A protein has these predicted regions:
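Rhodanese-like catalytic fold shared by cysteine-dependent sulfurtransferases
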Residues: 1-16, 21-25, 33-65, 71-106
Length: 106
């Protein structure tokens, strides 16, 4: 499904650059609901990876920009690659929730 040789049509920012943007962006946490409940970055909305990949049109609008986060940045990078190929404006959060140094919401 994904090739390491394909061009990335999305950008990435570090989890450490996210603080000033919280509350001003659409932040989507694509981890499973049990992971999200264990703790998530403030303002993040949970839409599991499988759901967003199977039916992006149910959750996303192609005229808006979304920041995608997971635990480490790997799932979010794969998701961004797919969604950008479908015409969605997405930004990967590298480092993910696991690298977030401030308190997580529960």
């Amino acid at each position: 499904m994904f090739s390491i040789f394909d061009k990335n049509d999305y950008s990435s920012i570090s989890i450490h650059d996210l603080d000033g943007r919280l509350g001003k962006i659409d932040l989507i946490d694509i981890r499973e609901p049990y992971e999200y409940k264990d703790g998530h970055v403030p303002t993040a909305k949970n839409i599991p990876m499988r759901a967003i990949l199977e039916h992006p049109e149910e959750y996303l609008n192609k005229s808006k920009e979304y920041h995608i986060i997971c635990q480490s940045g790997s799932r979010s990078a794969r998701t961004c690659k797919y969604l950008s190929g479908q015409g969605y404006k997405v930004i990967n959060i590298s480092g993910g929730t696991g690298s977030y140094i401030k308190p997580l919401e529960r």
